[in-house]
Amino acid sequence: AAFAGLTADARVLIRKARVEAQSYRLTVEDNPSVEYMARFIARQQQKHTVRGGVRPYGITCVIAGLANDGTPELWQSDPSGNYSAWRATTTGRNQKATREYLEKNYPADGEEPLTREQSIKLAITALCEVVDSSSKSIEVSVLEKGKEIAVLSDEAVEAVCKTIEAE
């Protein structure tokens, strides 16, 4: 999960989501779906929006994962409790510009899907539209079927940034 907003709120929601995922796994003896976790997080956010005496969570969450068949899923929830599925999305400062870039450059349904390298390059290029194009301001995590989540090294990100700048 990634988030934009108040870090303390994110920690609380992530802790609640982890407990819920563990409870689900013990009860059902299977991993919860990405949608289930997105719905759980959105429900927690919505409860704090309508309940008196507590302030709303001040974060937007982006939840990524793999379905049981290995297909990638991407969900986003906002402080009001709305959640929705995306093929590619952004959150935080300059969200509009990066989302517009992704909408223009992400393949439409039915088109050839992006390779791992193409996906990384597209994500970094979208970020370079709004931030300094260096490895110090960009962090990339890669989620692949059958593998652990990988965080790209600064050198790998810097190499992609240099390729983008050269184009």
Stretch-by-stretch model annotation:
Residues 1-167:
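Long, low-complexity N-terminal extensions
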